[in-house]
Amino acid sequence: MKRLKKTLHLSSLSLASLALSSAALAAAPVMLDQGKEWTESHRQDFYSRDQGSQVMPLPWLKALRQPDGTPFLADSLARYGYLPNPKAPAEGLPVGFTVAGTGARQMVGMTCSACHTRQIEVKGTAYRIDGGPAIVDFQAFLADLDRAVGPLTSDDAAFDAFAKQILGANPPPGARDALLAAVKEWYEPYHTLIERALPKDTWGPARLDAVSMIFNRLTGLDIGTAPPYLIPDNIKAADAPVRYPFLWNAARQNKTQWPGFAANGNDLLGLARNVGEVYGVFATFHPQKSKFHLLGMDYLKINSANFHGLGKLEDLIKKIGPPKWPWHLARKGALIFARKTDEGGCVECHGIRIKDLVLWDTPLRDVGSDSRQHAILDGQVQTGVMEGARMPFGQPLKATDGAFDVLAVAVAGSILQHFVPILGEKHDAKAAAVKPESVMTDETRQLLTAFQKPVRTQADPYPYESRVLQGIWAAAPYLHNGSVPTLEELLKPAAERVESFPVGSAYDVDKVGLAAQQTQFGSYVLKTTGCEQRDSGNSRCGHEYGTSLSAEEKRALLEYLKVL
């Protein structure tokens, strides 16, 4: 409880001192050139396409109040960095917030663009970058939502005002009590997650520990005995924050996620990555044992994942090109980029490596950067109702097993049950004895390796993906954990990099990254650690390449990185 109170206090201080560059953010932004395939209609689809996330009913969110009495949606959530969406599916919702269902059953959710749409500001002008890492404070949003709903469960006056907004002045008999019960049912798992998962040292803007939050939601809120499905002890502090990745060319990598544990290669593998994501972002999912399903589990009876929507979103992402640098520059540095790594070059790790007609090979290397995310991948949890569940050809989950393995089985099982008709149907006892291995195709077999822990060796104990650097200029802060504010700073030895810096939308086009002065999130400053604390989650250590280049060579390299 102390952790929650401190988190809420910190987020409130940050937001109370909010001084957004409102003129730039409110004005229509300049939409950067991201290729001919990326059209306005695709953009709007990307901003609002439902993927099955269910944050809360839309009428509730509209009626919800902040502690000072103002509507929770008063500024369209701009206080957290979310961007205005004039064509939102409901008034007041920002980019990346969705609505599914009808009438009182309309549910607000989140979609890819909430975390992967960026807006930067240069000299008072805002520039929109679709598919870019969002500069949003997701932890503050989560904590404040908890803070807004909590009083409704214990304060009659607060709940009466809330209920009047939803039910009207004269609700039918029993409606108030039913609404109160529904709010309490929503709040118990949500508050359990927030109280246990949000770290004392906040992620801050532009970062989150997505992997931990996926593990926490799935194993802490979804797979316990029904109801209420909770296994609170499975929820761990989400203290390995990373920078949101950019999406352009993500579908061309043969591996995704910062540690490289998610495979790419066909539509089902892309879907596996996205189903895992939506389970972490408010999808309703409660698998149940079922002896009449060939997998021994029913993954779809209580499952809000929108498989069609997820497929459409993956198709949209493939159309997003890297943003073209919109300002004047000298096109230099290509020769330096092409040098060997030990000569200060980049191409050996970050050049395009053609794997096949569809994919690029994505190297996984330990470059000395923060190691915390790898510890998250090794976490053990109680498997709850999923004890004994398995993928075809795989071993059953034990009573205590890896959170990573639970996620892999849950995602593969859901997709197999959805796409392979015989696996989605109930059967009589004789038919249910058929082994699921017998109905697997070459394509569905690839799901069995959709999630694989990265190979850790003595030479590379903590490897992370080395992505192609197209559009890297628009993706600050740098390193996988967002611990370095600019590319200029990244070309310095770790010991000489700045120890702390503010985070926001103001951009420095010369140093290529976050400007030294920010106002968007008030006084928030990200404090990093050095190489002596490599596992802090906030270490600025590692990637000491190009540090010995001359000042002229560094400037030429930065100019070249702007045009990739």
Tell what function each PLM region has:
Residues 11-23:
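Bacterial N-terminal signal peptides
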